[in-house]
Amino acid sequence: MYTLLSGLYKYMFQKDEYCILILGLDNAGKTTFLEQSKTRFNKNYKGMSLSKITTTVGLNIGTVDVGKARLMFWDLGGQEELQSLWDKYYAECHGVIYVIDSTDEERLSESKEAFEKVVSSEALDGVPILVLANKQDVETCLSIPDIKTAFSDCTCKIGRRDCLTQACSALTGKGVREGIEWMVKCVVRNVHRPPRQRDIT
């Protein structure tokens, strides 16, 4: 009887854990996106003041529960010298969120180069990628078609994995929930990367 009840409890309350990398150049808005995600999906999370967010040196970690999935976010620093550390996390991850500052046209080619390295990595084969064109609340930002055109060289390297380019404003929260919900659907159905662990709450 205990085994039956224990199994039922696990079935009803377990969370499948998925590791999601948040990548992109410095000042693209990765940490702001992470904070907005935690605020939108964790009822009791107060969150830090978005005006106090500074450039990430190293790693920020956050957790969000969406249905039966638990997303463990790893927000990695985007400075050039830190990008060499990104691939150390690839084997463990189930999905990638790549954040682009759509107001910074001068660094767009630099962002594309970094993205190209990400999608070219064999360690990320089949891993879904959400490309967020961030800062869409700014009038002078590049549009989604502009971003897609600038990154068109990378299309063939994306392969058969799930990939979505979406407008977002991490500051206002627009597009945050939609992006996370899309990622959850992708990681849950990706049989090539099963959940990292079972976590019972």
UniProtKB/Swiss-Prot annotation:
PROSITE patterns noted in UniProt: ARF (PS51417)
Record Pfam families: Arf (PF00025)
Tissue expression per record: Found in most tissues.
Function in brief: Trans-Golgi-associated GTPase that regulates protein sorting. Controls the targeting of ARL1 and its effector to the trans-Golgi. Required for the lipidation of chylomicrons in the intestine and required for VLDL lipidation in the liver.
Sites where the protein binds GTP: 24-31, 75-79, 134-137
Subunit structure: Interacts with SYS1.
SMART domains found in the cross-reference section: ARF (SM00177), RAB (SM00175), SAR (SM00178)
Source organism per UniProt: Rattus norvegicus (Rat)
GO CC aspect terms: cytosol; Golgi apparatus; membrane; trans-Golgi network
One GO term of the biological process aspect: gastrulation
Keywords: Acetylation, Golgi apparatus, GTP-binding, Nucleotide-binding
List of residues that carry N-acetylmethionine: 1
Name used for this protein in its record: ADP-ribosylation factor-related protein 1
A Gene Ontology molecular function term of the record: GTP binding
Family the entry assigns: Belongs to the small GTPase superfamily. Arf family.
Compartment(s) of residence: Golgi apparatus; Golgi apparatus, trans-Golgi network
Gene label: Arfrp1
Superkingdom classification of source: Eukaryota
